[in-house]
Every structure is written in structure tokens, then in C-alpha cells.
């Protein structure tokens, strides 16, 4: 079972809880979601609790992260979109921290679970819909009517726009889930290959050198992917929020 590259993604119950026939068990996924929030919040607290005129290196990391997301949101949704900064920043930090924690041996990768990434995506799209109707009423529906479309093509174009909008939670969640799942499976396969070859003595160790180099390279690439996936999720969130703030802008 330990050689199965998908074994690392199994959700196991830590504290079984069942209420009214519904399973509310505390699992390893639950544990690492709590750990992700704790690590992210703890990092931000420790690096910003003693704010100095001349920032320390760690304080600079927090400040750069803050400005990075702020500028992304201003570019994606305009100055009016800054009201969503706490949400976008929290999503970015949660996904980034979860991705990085998942890189450690025997740690659970929360973002490799489609139910987690889909919940995050539904939260984003739900926020877009609720705020869009709250701010613009039925004017929010202008989002589905692009400018300059001939009347004869309007039903077809509106249908395509609605389907495209409703597919956003799927594309947003699957992109993150699939990248993290594929990356970790690839790492597990190469690492298992190295371990298997090493068991054949000196000749096997010699043959394991190339797979070992590949494993190290893939590990470095996976750390980059961990950041890029958090970045992409945040960028797309900003773009979707722009539809709620400026529904008739396209």
C-alpha cells in the first residue's frame, strides 16, 4: 500500500463523529485544514506584530505579499474591488500554505481534494453572484449580454455566456486539484523508483542517480507550482469579482 502513489490522498478518520446518520468525523483532511489556517495566521502575526520603520526580512515578506495581492486586485477589479481584499488575500494565503505544507513527507495535501477546491470555487462564484445582485439588482444580468451583439444572435450568445459563467466553479476547482494531484503522484512515482533501484545494491544505486536527479528537479518545480496555483486562483478570483463590481464592462 505504501508504494501506491494515490495512497497519500486517502482521507482517514481521526475522531469518528456521527450525528443523525450524517458523518461529521474529524479527518486528516480536517486536521491539515486547521493546520493550514494556523500556520498562515501564525506567520502573518509573527511577522507583523512588531512593525518597524526598517522592516525585517520576514516583515518584508508579509508586506510584499500584502502589496502583491492589493495590486493584483486593483488591476483586476479596480479601486472599488478593494473591499474584497480580505477575501482574496485569505484565499491566496490558505491555498499557498496548504500547497507548501503538502510538500512535506507524511503531510496531507488539502488542495489535492476536489471537494476542498470546489468549495473554495463555489464560495468565490457565490460571492460574485450575491454581491452582483446586491449592488446592481437585475442590472447584474448585463454580464451575460455583451455589447454590440446583433439581436438575432442574442439568445445564442446569452446561452453561451450563462454556461460559461456556471462552469467557472468547475474549471477553477479542477485546475487547482488536478495540478496538485498530478504533481504529487509524479513525485511519488519517481521517489518510489529511486527506492526500488537502491534495493539492488551498488548497481541499483548507480542506476538510481538519474531518477534521483529528476526527483530533486521535480520537487523544485512542485514548489514553484504550489505558488503558481495560488497565484492563478487569486488572479481568476479578481477577474470574476470584476464582473460583480462592473457587470457591463465587457
From Swiss-Prot:
Report the membrane topology from the UniProt record.
Answer: Multi-pass membrane protein
UniProt key word Nuclease: no
Q: Which Gene3D superfamilies match?
A: ATP synthase, F0 complex, subunit A (1.20.120.220)
Q: Which UniProt keywords apply?
A: ATP synthesis, Cell inner membrane, Cell membrane, CF(0), Hydrogen ion transport, Ion transport, Membrane, Transmembrane, Transmembrane helix, Transport
List the Gene Ontology MF annotations in alphabetical order: proton-transporting ATP synthase activity, rotational mechanism
* PROSITE patterns for this protein: ATPASE_A (PS00449)
Q: Which CDD domains match?
A: ATP-synt_Fo_a_6 (cd00310)
GO CC annotation terms, alphabetical: plasma membrane; proton-transporting ATP synthase complex
Task: Decide whether keyword Transmembrane helix is in the record.
Answer: yes
Question: One Pfam match, by short name?
Answer: ATP-synt_A
Q: Where are the transmembrane segments?
A: 26-46, 84-104, 114-134, 143-163, 193-213, 216-236
Question: Quick one: where is this thing mainly located?
Answer: membrane
Determine the domain of life of the protein's source. Bacteria
Where in the cell is the protein located? Answer: Cell inner membrane
Family the UniProt entry places it in: Belongs to the ATPase A chain family.
The subunit structure is:
F-type ATPases have 2 components, CF(1) - the catalytic core - and CF(0) - the membrane proton channel. CF(1) has five subunits: alpha(3), beta(3), gamma(1), delta(1), epsilon(1). CF(0) has three main subunits: a(1), b(2) and c(9-12). The alpha and beta chains form an alternating ring which encloses part of the gamma chain. CF(1) is attached to CF(0) by a central stalk formed by the gamma and epsilon chains, while a peripheral stalk is formed by the delta and b chains.
Question: What NCBIfam families is this protein classified in?
Answer: ATP_synt_6_or_A (TIGR01131), PRK05815.2-4 (NF004482)
Its function, per the record, reads: Key component of the proton channel; it plays a direct role in the translocation of protons across the membrane.
Name of the featured protein: ATP synthase subunit a
Tell me which species this is from: Sinorhizobium fredii (strain NBRC 101917 / NGR234)
Q: Which gene encodes it?
A: atpB
Amino acid at each position: 500500500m505504501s508504494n501506491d502513489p494515490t495512497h497519500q490522498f486517502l482521507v482517514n478518520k481521526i475522531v469518528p463523529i456521527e450525528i443523525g446518520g450524517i458523518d461529521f468525523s474529524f479527518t486528516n483532511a480536517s486536521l491539515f485544514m486547521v493546520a493550514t489556517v494556523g500556520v498562515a495566521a501564525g506567520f502573518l502575526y509573527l511577522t507583523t506584530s512588531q512593525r518597524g520603520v526598517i522592516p525585517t526580512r520576514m516583515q518584508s515578506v508579509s508586506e510584499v505579499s500584502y502589496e502583491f495581492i492589493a495590486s493584483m486586485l486593483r488591476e483586476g477589479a479596480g479601486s472599488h474591488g478593494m473591499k474584497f481584499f480580505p477575501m482574496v488575500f485569505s484565499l491566496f494565503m490558505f491555498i499557498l500554505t496548504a500547497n507548501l505544507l503538502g510538500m512535506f513527507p507524511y503531510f496531507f495535501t488539502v488542495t489535492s481534494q476536489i471537494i476542498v477546491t470546489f468549495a473554495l470555487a463555489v464560495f468565490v462564484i457565490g460571492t460574485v453572484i450575491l454581491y452582483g445582485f446586491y449592488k446592481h439588482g437585475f442590472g447584474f444580468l448585463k454580464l451575460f449580454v455583451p455589447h454590440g451583439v446583433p439581436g438575432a444572435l442574442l439568445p445564442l450568445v446569452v446561452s453561451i455566456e450563462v454556461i460559461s459563467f456556471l462552469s467557472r466553479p468547475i474549471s477553477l476547482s479542477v485546475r487547482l486539484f488536478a495540478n496538485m494531484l498530478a504533481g504529487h503522484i509524479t513525485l511519488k512515482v519517481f521517489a518510489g523508483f529511486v527506492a526500488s533501484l537502491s534495493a539492488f545494491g551498488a548497481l541499483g544505486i548507480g542506476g538510481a542517480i538519474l531518477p534521483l536527479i529528476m526527483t530533486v528537479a521535480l520537487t523544485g518545480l512542485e514548489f514553484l507550482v504550489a505558488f503558481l496555483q495560488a497565484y492563478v486562483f487569486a488572479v481568476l478570483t479578481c477577474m470574476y469579482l470584476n464582473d460583480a463590481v462592473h457587470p457591463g464592462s465587457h
